[in-house]
Every structure is written in C-alpha cells, then in structure tokens.
Amino acid sequence: MPKNSKVTQREHSNEHVTESVADLLALEEPVDYKQSVLNVAGETGGKQKVAEEELDAEDRPAWNSKLQYILAQIGFSVGLGNIWRFPYLCQKNGGGAYLVPYLVLLIIIGIPLFFLELAVGQRIRRGSIGVWHYVCPRLGGIGFSSCIVCLFVGLYYNVIIGWSVFYFFKSFQYPLPWSECPVIRNGTVAVVEPECEKSSATTYFWYREALDISNSISESGGLNWKMTVCLLVAWSIVGMAVVKGIQSSGKVMYFSSLFPYVVLACFLVRGLLLRGAVDGILHMFTPKLDKMLDPQVWREAATQVFFALGLGFGGVIAFSSYNKQDNNCHFDAALVSFINFFTSVLATLVVFAVLGFKANIMNEKCVVENAEKILGYLNSNVLSRDLIPPHVNFSHLTTKDYSEMYNVIMTVKEKQFSALGLDPCLLEDELDKSVQGTGLAFIAFTEAMTHFPASPFWSVMFFLMLINLGLGSMIGTMAGITTPIIDTFKVPKEMFTVGCCVFAFFVGLLFVQRSGNYFVTMFDDYSATLPLTVIVILENIAVAWIYGTKKFMQELTEMLGFRPYRFYFYMWKFVSPLCMAVLTTASIIQLGVSPPGYSAWIKEEAAERYLYFPNWAMALLITLIAVATLPIPVVFILRHFHLLSDGSNTLSVSYKKGRMMKDISNLEENDETRFILSKVPSEAPSPMPTHRSYLGPGSTSPLESSSHPNGRYGSGYLLASTPESEL
C-alpha cells in the first residue's frame, strides 16, 4: 500500500479506525439514521444496487408543482375513449342503468388498482421495468410487457391524432368540405359523385377524401400521402412535447389537459340550445334496468374502467415516480378517477345533445322524402286520397302528421305496403343507431356540425380538442416507454426519445396505407386488451400475494403518514384479483366465440360490410398478443433457472451522505481496511436500533424471524414492522 495513502496515515495515527459495518453504523449521525437506507441483497430477494439507486433518486427530475402532476395524470387517463367509447357503451348497455355497474367496478377495481400503481411508482421511483424488478425479480418481465403494449398503442393512437390534424386544417373554409357531395363534370353534364350519393357527404369525405380506403385489409393500395404528412406532423408534435421529459411535457399539460374541458363546456352550452338536444339526452339516460342483469354489460363496463384509467401501460407508474415520497397518492387516485368519470359523463351529455339535434334533422329529412313518395303515389292513383287525414298539410308536414298518415296507409294497404317502400321515420330509430369510435368523431359529429351556425369555428374547436386529448394520452404512453428504458439502461434521454419517435413514424406507415384503417381496428381491438389484463392481474398478484398486502399497507403508512382504509386490503388481496381473472377469462372466451373481424368499406356498394380477418392477419394478431405477453414467462424462466442475474448475488451497504458502498462479497478475508469513516469516536451516536443493524452472511434479522420473511420490497429493504394487530 502506498505510504502516503489515507489508510497508512491513519494506521500510524491515534485516530479511531472502523473495523466493521457495526462500527460504521455506530458512527452515523442521528440525522443520517432517518435518511439512511440499509440494503442487504441476499439470496432470497436481491435488488438493484442501492448506491446507484440513491444517486438516481436524488438526481431524478420532479414535477414543478402538484397541479402539473395532476394535470399529467388527467391528460393521460382522459383520452379519446372518453369521447367516443363511453357514450356508445352507455347507449348500448342500458343508458342510465349502465352507470351503476360502471361505478361499482370503478370502486372495486379501478380506484384500488390505480392507487396501487401510483403507490409503487412513488415509493420505488422507477419506471415499470425497475418497479416490478424491484418488487419481484422473477416477475420483472411485467415492465417489459408494459413497454411493448405502450409501443403498440402509440403506433396506432398517433395515427388518430394525424386524422384529427387533417380535419383540423380542412376546417378553415366555408362551407366545410364535407357538407356537400362533390359534383363530377363531364363537358356540359354534371352529376353527383355516385359513391357519395349512395351514402352521405360526411361518410364519403371520411372514407374517400381522407382515408381513400381500399375494399379490404388484403388490398394495400399504397401509401396515402395526405395521411403520411399528417402522421409526420403528429409525431413531430409528440416528439417536441416529450423530448425533455417532464420538463417539457409538464408545461404542455397545462394546455392539453385543460383545453378539452373548455371545448366540452362550450359544446354543451351550444348543444343544449339546439332543437332536439333534450330528446337525445333523455334517450341517453333513460335507464333500461333489465340490462343490469346481462353479464356482457358488466364485462364491457369492467373493460372500460380498466382502459379509462390507463392501468398496466406504465404511464401511471412513470408519472408518479417523479413525485416526492410523502405525496398523498391516495388522494390523487380518488381525484383522478372521479375526474375521469365526470369527463365521461360530460362527454356523453355533449355527444347525445348533438346527436339528438342530428337525429331530429335526419328525421325531418326522412319525413320530407317519404311525403314526396306519397304525393307521387297519390298523383298516379296508386293510393287513394281518402287515406290521407283531412288535417294533413303536405306543405307544412310535421313528424306527428306523417306518423299518423303512415299508420293509416300501413293498415289499409297491408298486403301491398312493403312494395311502397315507405319508412316509419321514427326519432327513436335515429337515436338507436349506435355509433362509436371514428364513426362518431369523423362522420356523425362532423355531419351535425355542418348544421351549426358558424360551423367552421365549431369544427376547428372540436378537432383541436381531439388533438389535445390524444396528445395528453400520447405523452403518458411515451413515458411508459421512455422512463423505464432510460432508468434501466441509462441511455441518453433526448437521443432515445427522438429515436423512438422516428422509429414509430416509419413503423406507423403501416397505418397510413389505403388499408391502414383496418390495421388501426386490429391493433385497437386486439393488440392491447388481453395483454393489459394479464399485466394488471400479475401486478396485483406481485404486490398482494408475493410481496404481501400487510407489508405493502405498512409501507404506505410510512410513506403517506396515515394508514389507508382496510377496504384496500381486501380489494387488493381478494376482490380485484378475482375480478381481473374473470375479465381475462371472459376476454379469451370472447375471442374464441366471436371470430375477429372488421368493418370494410365497399366502394361499389357505398356501404360497410363486416369481414373476417384473413389467415395472415389472424397470424399477425396472434403474434401481437404473444409478443406483448412473452417477456413475462421468459424473464420468469431465466431467473428461476439462474440464467439471468437478478442482482441477488451481492451484499451491499449504501449511505446517502457518505455515498459509500462496497461489495462485501468481493472483500478479501483479512482485509482490515475495508470500511473507514473519517469521524472521531466522540462523535458517534448510540448504537442503531435492531431493525437497522447490519446483517452478516447467514445471520437472521428480527424482521425475518417474524411474520415478514422477506422484508419490505424483498429482503433488501428492511424497516421497522407495524404490529399486525393494527391492521
């Protein structure tokens, strides 16, 4: 050893030399005791190297304010599904009665599991990969599966933002380009586009002008250059929003999370002033109580709760990992969950106020068209004028008058009635036409807005709202990819984020072919549903059964400063896993009972037709599900047979102040200089409490001899235990 080394100098001095870890702990200042972390990575629960974790935790970015964090969680959880999925499910599954199973499942599944993800992210301060490796190394594949699902969802979700960008720029003109069918001129002859005439102006614009869609998924048709440019714009927006992490995305959230509520409020006020709005809202919330007994309603409600909160994606964990340790994540879970529910109900009011207005217009149009048919039959003596009630005035025909006339003709001309081709023109029939997803946003809603005064203004506002809703969700989705990868592999943040956006843009070209909409349907319906249910049920099992619900509750008590309700103990331990298992089983059965398919637009018929996926598409679909779930069994097998290190072969001690760490397994047996602390003995406080004392190889902790065999988050994180009697 060099003569001028500090060890040699101290050996020749009278200064006290620490010979062991026990002495080292005895010299720790009282203030260090509160902030120190003792990590013993033994064979039964090895964790990541703690010195690196301490450094990362101190250097980890943080939210500028609690408001910024809440807006980020709201922006991620409140997305396009709240606008076009929830209203459709509400209408389909019993109107107001659907809110009962939804609220019940939100309370017993949604909030507990959302709280769980917030808590583990905030406690461990890592992305999804680091969190689940830390809780249970053998289930570390959960984090990788979350990243893959986020990638799949981000690929097609940003395409929808691209569609909204296209409509947004097309809205800056009057009249709106989808308000009338195009006219084809051939010399002096002008005819309406046949495809548009058979369908409608908004439907034609969506399928032909925007998507230029092919007749099936097997017909690629090449790239749609307009949508390719819009996809590039969409990924550029997302890239700029997330390139600096929460420093950049947090500022974007102030606008992207709040602006949609301004637009929804404006649409609600405007919608309530429209003729027929009340009809739509009453139709929406009139409860059909018999639907509550249908298991399918509960399955769809559970699925919607599950996806509405963004469970399993990793975005919730990523956002909460930037919080302070003492943040009240229990309050955050309840607040964000109920804001999400409130947004869904608000969006439903807006949608059905507007659809009620549209239904009235379409109903009046139907009455006019059928009245013209009846006049034609009267003039050609096919029908007798005696069939027309005397008070009916064809120049001012009301829906009530038409309904009365229709019933008389149907009764008298019972045998010949079907040949007349008359429609009943019932308002209920128009309102019962279930529209969801892109059909609601890009067809039904756009058609309604063409009848608004100042329609371009409302169109600009609507599609700007969709862009912001999508952007908020994409920021969370990207965080679910970038945060765990950056935390785990220490790659440069900006370079990796930009690389992800570039990669996703080129892969996303699959969705901007002329057949791209069919691939969006495939990914939306099948790529994430089953994998996410598997991910969340394993997250629940990892915390509640492998780590231990009692220990987790105690950790929450130490972190929050109060004990969470015992309600969560039973939800995490029993109810939520059972519900998730039933949902997973139901999803698998649904895939088997209903062969996967999609709605194709047939140009020649100008109508949709349901087609089944061809064999190669089914193979792709199965591959997507397999790739998303494969990391879970792979990591489990590799770590079970010790083919992949889980960090359990090292025994390490780390200090926040001294930043001192040495791998004891690598120390020489007679090394007397292994731990030296530059403090004099007089500064040493009293010995550390038992639960903070050093555990040598083969020794037993008082905690390990109790009912907590693995310590907190495994044997590497030991804190004082709370008596079970308090649980």
From Swiss-Prot:
<comment type="function">
    <text>Synaptic vesicle transporter with apparent selectivity for neutral amino acids. The transport is sodium-coupled but chloride-independent, likely driven by the proton electrochemical gradient generated by vacuolar H(+)-ATPase in an overall electrogenic mechanism. May contribute to the synaptic uptake of neurotransmitter precursors in a process coupled in part to vesicle exocytosis.</text>
</comment>
<keyword id="KW-1133">Transmembrane helix</keyword>
<dbReference type="GO" id="GO:0032328">
    <property type="term" value="P:alanine transport"/>
</dbReference>
<keyword id="KW-0472">Membrane</keyword>
<keyword id="KW-0769">Symport</keyword>
<feature type="topological domain" description="Cytoplasmic">
    <location>
        <begin position="117"/>
        <end position="140"/>
    </location>
</feature>
<keyword id="KW-0770">Synapse</keyword>
<feature type="topological domain" description="Extracellular">
    <location>
        <begin position="162"/>
        <end position="224"/>
    </location>
</feature>
<feature type="transmembrane region" description="Helical; Name=7">
    <location>
        <begin position="334"/>
        <end position="355"/>
    </location>
</feature>
<feature type="topological domain" description="Extracellular">
    <location>
        <begin position="356"/>
        <end position="451"/>
    </location>
</feature>
<keyword id="KW-0597">Phosphoprotein</keyword>
<feature type="transmembrane region" description="Helical; Name=5">
    <location>
        <begin position="252"/>
        <end position="269"/>
    </location>
</feature>
<feature type="glycosylation site" description="N-linked (GlcNAc...) asparagine">
    <location>
        <position position="393"/>
    </location>
</feature>
<feature type="transmembrane region" description="Helical; Name=9">
    <location>
        <begin position="495"/>
        <end position="513"/>
    </location>
</feature>
<dbReference type="InterPro" id="IPR000175">
    <property type="entry name" value="Na/ntran_symport"/>
</dbReference>
<keyword id="KW-0739">Sodium transport</keyword>
<feature type="topological domain" description="Cytoplasmic">
    <location>
        <begin position="472"/>
        <end position="494"/>
    </location>
</feature>
<dbReference type="GO" id="GO:0035725">
    <property type="term" value="P:sodium ion transmembrane transport"/>
</dbReference>
<keyword id="KW-0968">Cytoplasmic vesicle</keyword>
<dbReference type="GO" id="GO:0015816">
    <property type="term" value="P:glycine transport"/>
</dbReference>
<dbReference type="Pfam" id="PF00209">
    <property type="entry name" value="SNF"/>
</dbReference>
<feature type="modified residue" description="Phosphotyrosine">
    <location>
        <position position="377"/>
    </location>
</feature>
<dbReference type="InterPro" id="IPR002438">
    <property type="entry name" value="Neutral_aa_SLC6"/>
</dbReference>
<dbReference type="GO" id="GO:0098978">
    <property type="term" value="C:glutamatergic synapse"/>
</dbReference>
<feature type="modified residue" description="Phosphoserine">
    <location>
        <position position="701"/>
    </location>
</feature>
<feature type="transmembrane region" description="Helical; Name=8">
    <location>
        <begin position="452"/>
        <end position="471"/>
    </location>
</feature>
<dbReference type="GO" id="GO:0098982">
    <property type="term" value="C:GABA-ergic synapse"/>
</dbReference>
<dbReference type="GO" id="GO:0045202">
    <property type="term" value="C:synapse"/>
</dbReference>
<dbReference type="GO" id="GO:0015804">
    <property type="term" value="P:neutral amino acid transport"/>
</dbReference>
<feature type="topological domain" description="Cytoplasmic">
    <location>
        <begin position="1"/>
        <end position="68"/>
    </location>
</feature>
<feature type="topological domain" description="Extracellular">
    <location>
        <begin position="514"/>
        <end position="528"/>
    </location>
</feature>
<dbReference type="GO" id="GO:0015293">
    <property type="term" value="F:symporter activity"/>
</dbReference>
<feature type="transmembrane region" description="Helical; Name=11">
    <location>
        <begin position="570"/>
        <end position="591"/>
    </location>
</feature>
<feature type="topological domain" description="Cytoplasmic">
    <location>
        <begin position="323"/>
        <end position="333"/>
    </location>
</feature>
<feature type="topological domain" description="Cytoplasmic">
    <location>
        <begin position="244"/>
        <end position="251"/>
    </location>
</feature>
<feature type="topological domain" description="Cytoplasmic">
    <location>
        <begin position="642"/>
        <end position="727"/>
    </location>
</feature>
<feature type="transmembrane region" description="Helical; Name=6">
    <location>
        <begin position="305"/>
        <end position="322"/>
    </location>
</feature>
<feature type="region of interest" description="Disordered">
    <location>
        <begin position="680"/>
        <end position="727"/>
    </location>
</feature>
<dbReference type="InterPro" id="IPR037272">
    <property type="entry name" value="SNS_sf"/>
</dbReference>
<keyword id="KW-0406">Ion transport</keyword>
<keyword id="KW-0532">Neurotransmitter transport</keyword>
<feature type="transmembrane region" description="Helical; Name=4">
    <location>
        <begin position="225"/>
        <end position="243"/>
    </location>
</feature>
